[in-house]
């Protein structure tokens, strides 16, 4: 029939679905370690460490060689440099992950640029040459990919506009189709920034508009939902809202918005932390899973909310490696328990309760 796309082979569809299910396994989630060179410079600056390739390799080796990490981490998103990088002892980073049973993934977008004739609304770059890059990434050991799109809320200015939502949905769908054609599970990330003074009900309404558009576009582009994953924001109040929402409210509105818009064929929803403190990111996820069962796994794909305390424990000092790995394991365990709705709170103490919010966050 006309109007239908060419199906991917049963072999590829099976591989995609199996890998997506493995990544969304109960009690596990994703370590997002795909910071660009510029972003990791900001992280290193905060602890007084020079942003050299050697220091980046040491730090990522610290993360990926943590014994037992695979108990709670199913996948790790890498920056392109890291996919081809070796540890200080000469072991490929990909092999460190595989030794723990962790599936390597790759950030494939090329960052954001402003949509012309808009009030600073963003489009994501990187579709040019993506198919060829995906082939190379698969050969290097990657089995999933991530593409970040960004939207902002400003009711007074009508943001996000329909143009912004359409652009985000179209870009994510094209990316996802290209990935699946090249045997990579696409993680679809439409991040609605928390900047603003709006309350949680506004975020819920915008999240539903965005996700409805994204899944319509994925359908239009013949994307196999069983072989894809979603990385959305949680539904929260704006960062400047005078009346912050509780963990229970965040869980209620987030789950409601997902059930209204996300097809149950999708294996998993892997939340971004969006500048929440490490502890809030765990507690909010825990509250959602206490409300289960859900049509899909609700899990995590955290960067700052897994690494912040670990980075501070390391401080760029080689002798602190074991201590930093212990801190990482503590945070990974907390989130693994939260995925099961069994996190009791308190991991990491006061340090884990510190906000990680950055205005107009650029990854």
Curated annotation (Swiss-Prot):
Pathway: Carbohydrate degradation; glycolysis; D-glyceraldehyde 3-phosphate and glycerone phosphate from D-glucose: step 4/4
InterPro entries linked to this entry: Aldolase_I_AS (IPR029768), Aldolase_TIM (IPR013785), FBA_I (IPR000741)
Localization per Swiss-Prot or TrEMBL: Cytoplasm
Gene Ontology CC terms, in alphabetical order: cytoplasm
EC number: 4.1.2.13
Reaction(s) the record says it catalyses: beta-D-fructose 1,6-bisphosphate = D-glyceraldehyde 3-phosphate + dihydroxyacetone phosphate
Top-level taxon of origin: Eukaryota
Effect in UniProt of substituting residue 148 to A: Abolishes enzymatic activity. Reduces ACT1 binding. Reduces MIC2 binding
Result of altering residue 42 to A: Does not affect enzymatic activity. Reduces ACT1 binding. Reduces MIC2 binding. Abolishes enzymatic activity and reduces MIC2 binding
Major subcellular location class: cytoplasm
Binding site for dihydroxyacetone phosphate: 34, 146, 231, 273-274, 303-304
Homology family: Belongs to the class I fructose-bisphosphate aldolase family.
Primary role: Plays a key role in glycolysis by catalyzing the cleavage of fructose 1,6-bisphosphate into dihydroxyacetone phosphate and glyceraldehyde 3-phosphate. Forms a bridge between cell surface adhesins and the actin cytoskeleton. Required for parasite invasion of host cells.
PANTHER family referenced in this protein's UniProt entry, alphabetically: FRUCTOSE-BISPHOSPHATE ALDOLASE
Subunit architecture: Homotetramer. Component of a complex, at least composed of ald-1, microneme protein MIC2 and ACT1. Interacts with microneme protein MIC2 (via cytoplasmic tail). Interacts with ACT1 (F-actin).
Protein name: Fructose-bisphosphate aldolase 1
UniProt organism field: Toxoplasma gondii
């Amino acid at each position: 029939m006309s109007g239908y796309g060419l199906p991917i082979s049963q072999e590829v569809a099976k591989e995609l679905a199996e890998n997506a299910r493995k990544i969304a396994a109960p009690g596990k989630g994703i370590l997002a370690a795909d910071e660009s060179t510029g972003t990791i410079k900001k992280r290193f600056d905060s602890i007084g460490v020079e942003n050299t390739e050697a220091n980046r390799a040491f730090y990522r080796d610290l993360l990926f060689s943590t014994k037992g990490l695979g108990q709670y981490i199913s996948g790790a998103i890498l920056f392109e440099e890291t996919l081809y990088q070796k540890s200080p002892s000469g072991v490929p980073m990909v092999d460190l992950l595989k030794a723990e049973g962790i599936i390597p993934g790759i950030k494939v977008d090329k960052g954001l640029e402003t949509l012309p004739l808009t009030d600073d609304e963003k489009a994501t770059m990187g579709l040019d040459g993506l198919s060829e890059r995906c082939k190379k990434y698969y050969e290097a050991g990657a089995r999933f990919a991530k593409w970040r799109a960004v939207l902002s809320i400003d009711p007074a200015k009508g943001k996000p506009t329909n143009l912004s939502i359409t652009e985000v949905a179209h870009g994510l769908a094209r990316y996802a189709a290209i990935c699946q054609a090249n045997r990579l599970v696409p993680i679809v990330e439409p991040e609605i920034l928390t900047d603003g003074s709006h309350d949680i009900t506004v975020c819920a309404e915008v999240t539903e508009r965005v996700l409805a558009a994204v899944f319509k576009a994925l359908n239009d582009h013949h994307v196999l939902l069983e072989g894809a994953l979603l990385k959305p924001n949680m539904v929260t109040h704006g960062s400047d809202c005078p009346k912050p929402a509780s963990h229970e409210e965040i869980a209620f509105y987030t789950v409601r918005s997902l059930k209204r818009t996300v097809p149950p064929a999708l294996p998993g929803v892997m939340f971004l932390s969006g500048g929440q403190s490490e502890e809030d990111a765990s507690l909010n996820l825990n509250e959602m899973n206490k409300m289960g069962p859900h049509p899909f796994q609700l899990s995590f794909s955290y960067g700052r909310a897994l690494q912040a305390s670990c980075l501070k424990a390391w401080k760029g000092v080689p002798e602190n490696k074991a201590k930093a790995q212990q801190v990482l394991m503590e945070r990974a365990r907390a989130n693994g328990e939260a995925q099961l709705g069994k996190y009791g709170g308190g991991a990491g103490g006061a340090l884990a309760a510190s906000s990680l919010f950055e205005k107009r966050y650029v990854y």
